[in-house]
Every structure is written in structure tokens, then in C-alpha cells.
Amino acid sequence: MAKVIGIDLGTTNSCVAVMEGSSAKVIENSEGMRTTPSMVAFTQDGERLVGQSAKRQAVTNPTNTLFAIKRLIGRSYDDPTTQKDKGMVPYDIVKAPNGDAWVEAHGEKYSPSQISAFILQKMKETAESYLGEKVEKAVITVPAYFNDAQRQATKDAGKIAGLEVLRIINEPTAAALAYGLDKKEGELIAVYDLGGGTFDVSILEIGDGVFEVKSTNGDTFLGGEDFDMRLVNYLADEFKKENGIDLRGDKLALQRLKEAAEKAKIELSSASQTEVNLPFITADASGPKHLTMKITRSKLEALVADLIQRTIDPCKAALKDAGVTAGQINEIVLVGGQSRMPKIREAVKQFFGKEPNMSVNPDEVVAMGAAIQAGVLQGDVKDVLLLDVTPLSLGIETLGGVFTRLIERNTTIPTKKAQTFSTAEDNQSAVTIRVFQGEREMAADNKLLGQFDLVGIPAAPRGVPQIEVAFDIDANGIVNVSAKDKATNKEQTIRIEASGGLSEADIEQMVKDAEAHAEEDKKRREEVETRNHAEALANATEKTLQENADKIGGDVKADVEAALEALRTALKEGSSEDIKAKMEALTQTSMKMGEALYKSAQAEAESEAAGGTDASGDDVVDADFEEVDDDKKDQDKSA
């Protein structure tokens, strides 16, 4: 049976794992790394780079290197968080025809689902390379606090990447799976997950194979990227005070600042002080400017104190929703790279009253949990029951713009709930069902997931028609809504897409584009390999010619030199097919050179052999000798 992989599609880094026997194994990528940067870049000549190769060239190509794309997935362009993000990244965020936030690189517009698909493709290829077989199915993780639009957009990304997404699983739940798979005793655990772009906290009861999520809370726009930006702004402000130049106006300088800030932040987790040193960061009329600044751990902690505090409020809400106190929590599991910061660990310890558990790798545990869930779905992992919850309340807009909840937050999923409504006016023949997700009392203050019309309601006074609205949330946390007129049994059903969202046609087109790109990438790789082989052949032939010029006949030498020159010209100007043809011609001509060298070597060997035979006669020296008889020998001895 083909393997199902587990993918942690992260804001900053992504990770892929697979079940091997009874345990999950993280797979190393082609660079030998266990995590892959969630970055996609488009070069000047149209090449697409993903992961480490994209990160390496980010400083020189900031406007076409896309990162932290997960913060845009499933969001509209007008969303305040999108507008905030525009000031944090050097690439362009644009408004799509459907109102969603998309990105632009080299004049091409891409949806966040497409960019995420390129990253998922890289993870898929990493797994295929390790397993030696095609991978077509996956379990993908998302922040627990992702709404329906964000979950659907992640599932779309999987489809574009050529993966059947068997399950969307919440990141803290995945981490709990990896942490608690071998725990037999009942435990109440808190998973504190602070990643690159999102924060989640989940309270779970685990033991004897049952993982029950009691509550979840979080902030989908709070993570390591925000910590980096605090340091970037501090460095930029200090530099401006000193030099009168705002580095944030220069995209290349901003990218260098961002990389330096991230590096400094990581170093300050183990050191009390570090130095940011960026020579030639900019220039003015007086000449080049350099940025050199010492940063202490206490300075960084002061810069991000409010961000750390922002993670504590969701912890309080999660405990309240679960009906437990901090003292009742047995273990606190830290997840996400940003959770390595000592001040964060201190804040968590202070809030929960105990040391957080450091036994799991915060960068890998989520992918491992996804692989375990994949194993459960495949039947390879037995006796594991996962009971997750919906993070936000779901409901519809009713008279006066009120948000009427049908499913409360932290309800165990999958779940189904129905409620009967009626018309607001006499003889109303149609109703518009507007579906929202959130916790505010007025519908307009929550996230509009979608809307649809139920038409053909028989004329009747207001309040008489019976319209049943049913919500159905599947195990992925994705919503289906139906409305039925009980009198006529007319029913209208929609699978919620983001109010913008990608249509099936959009997704199909993106799948085709991804496949075309895969072919393009394969062709490009083959072209590079052909050129490399051609260069190697040309160099080897040239070396042979130089070393054996006196042993090759004039005609053969002229033919080889002509074929070599033709290949060199093809390498400069020719197509891949032309290079292959010239390589073949040079190979054939070189065979004649080989024959000539062989004949020359054979002739030399024969000449040496013949010379050796003559020498045995010519070089012998005739010596005078006297024959002595035996009697004479005896006399000599006695003398």
C-alpha cells in the first residue's frame, strides 16, 4: 500500500514525516536538512526556486522571493491583518479579482494556495526521493485557530500540489499525538504552539490511545515574524537616528536587515549579547554606510514583551473554556521554533506554575504527529482515537444583523446541528443564508464564510414558513451548510468556500499549471545536465588533444578540433538538441582519435619489443677466459 505522508506546512519552515514501523520518522530534504524554508522565489530567467535555494538568493532578489505566505492564506485583501502584512514584506501583495489577497512576482499574480502548493510539492518530492515510490496522499497540519476559509485554502494547496489531502489536522493536536502516543496514564496537557506566523494553545486530555481536545484558542497573526519585525524596526530606527536614512524604504536593505534580525534573535536564545554587522547597507553623498550594533538579550525581551503577553490571554481563555485551572495541567508541551526563546519559556512557567516539557523537538513534532494521524487513517497505527474541536463558533445572520450561533466553539468534530428559522416579511419567496464564523454578537463583526439563496418558498405570512438550516462540520473542520423549506422539501446546500476563495475551475487550472511547471522543471534540469555533460566531454577531448598532439595524425586532429569547436559554439548559442547532436559528432570523431592513439601505442610497444631482441646480441661484451682443469683447481687451493 502506498505511504501516506504527514506535512507540517509552516509559516517559516516546513517539515515532512512518515511512519516507519511504530514510530514517525522525519525525512531529510535534498540539502540534508530536516526542515525546509517555506520560501518560493522566481528568478529573472523564469526559474522557480523552493526552500533553501530560494532563501539563499533572497537578499539579491527581495521583491520576487515570497515568504510567510501562510499569513495570507484564506484572507481577503481588505482584511486589516493583510494591510498590516503589506508593510512587513518586500514583495507585492495585490487584490485578486475575487477580493482575496494574492502576491505578485515578475508581473505574474499567484494565490497563496498556489505558493503553498509549490512548498508542498517540494515536501512531496522529498518524501518520494526517500521512499523510492510515488506519494499521492497526505495529512497536512494547520493552526488550530484557522477558520474555515483558511482550512479550505490549505486543502486547495494540497490539491494543486497533486496530493489528496486525507485530513487537515490542527497543529497542537498533531504535537500532542507525537508527544502522547506511548502515554498510558490519563494526563491533562497544554500545547503552547508559537510558530513563525501563528500562535495556538490547546488543552487536551490524553491517555490509553484517546486524544480529546477540550478547548483551543489562539491568534493567527502572531509569531516569530512579528518578533523579527520588532528587531528590524529597532535596528532601522537606531540607524536612522545616526545617519538620517530610513532603511525600510530600500527593499534590498530591508531584506538584509530581516535576515540579520532573525539570526540575532536565534543567537540571543543561547547568548546574552550578539552583534549585528551589515557592511555597505546603504550609501549617501558622503559615501557608503555600515550598520554595526550590539544587541543584548534584555533589549530584545523589552522590545517583544507585549507580544509575549499576547500569548498569555489565549491561554487563560483556553483554560476557562476547558473548565480547568492552570494547576490541574500535568504537562505543558512547547511547539514552534519561537518557543525556544528563554523569556517565553519563563512566561509559560510563570503562568502554568510548572516547568514546560522540553522533550520534543519543537520544529519536528507537528510533522511527526501528522505522520501518526496518516498511520491511523491507513490502519497502520491501532487503538488511537482523536477527538478534535472546532475553534470558532459558527452561525448565520438573522433579523437585525444578529449573529445566531448554531455550533458553539470547542464543539467536538465531526458534528451536525440544525435549527428552524422563518421569514421576516409577508409573502417572502426567498431567503439569503449568510454564514459567519467568530465570537462577536453582531454578524458583521465576524468572518463571512459564504452565502447562498433558498428560493421558491410558497407565499405565506411572515413567521409561517419553516426553514431548517443545518451545519455539518467534517473531521477537517470544513463546513457544509444546507437550508430546507419544510413545506416543499426544497433544499439548497453549499460547501463553504471563502467569500472570495478559489473555484473548482481555478483549482483545476492551477493543478495544470503546477503539472506544466513540473514538466518545465524536468526539462530545465535535463538541459542543465546535457550542458554539464557537454562541457565535461569538451574539456576531456581538449586535454587529450593537448597531451597527445604528436601521436595523432593531421587529418584526425583537424576533424576532432572542428567537432570540438562546433560543440563549443553550440554551448554558447545552441539549443539542447543542437548540443546533443554536436556531442554525438564529437564522440564519433573522438573514436578516430582513440584509434590513432591506440595504433601509436601499439607501434611503440612493437618497436620496443623488437629493439629488446636486437640488444641481446649487440650489447654482449666478449670476455677472455681460460679453461682450468680440475687438477689445477686443487693445486691452487692447496697453495
From Swiss-Prot:
It comes from the Bacteria. CDD domains: ASKHA_NBD_HSP70_HSPA9 (cd11733). GO terms for molecular function: ATP binding; ATP-dependent protein folding chaperone; unfolded protein binding. InterPro entries: ATPase_NBD, Chaperone_DnaK, Heat_shock_70_CS, HSP70_C_sf, HSP70_peptide-bd_sf, Hsp_70_fam. Residues 597-639 are annotated as: Disordered. Keywords: ATP-binding, Chaperone, Nucleotide-binding, Phosphoprotein, Stress response. Induction: By stress conditions e.g. heat shock. SUPFAM superfamilies: Actin-like ATPase domain, Heat shock protein 70kD (HSP70), C-terminal subdomain, Heat shock protein 70kD (HSP70), peptide-binding domain. The modification Phosphothreonine is found at residue 198. Residues 630-639 have a biased composition (Basic and acidic residues). Residues 600-615 have a biased composition (Low complexity). Residues 616-629 have a biased composition (Acidic residues). Belongs to the heat shock protein 70 family. Acts as a chaperone. NCBIfam families: PRK00290.1, PRK05183.1, prok_dnaK. HAMAP family: DnaK. This is Chaperone protein DnaK. It comes from Parvibaculum lavamentivorans (strain DS-1 / DSM 13023 / NCIMB 13966).
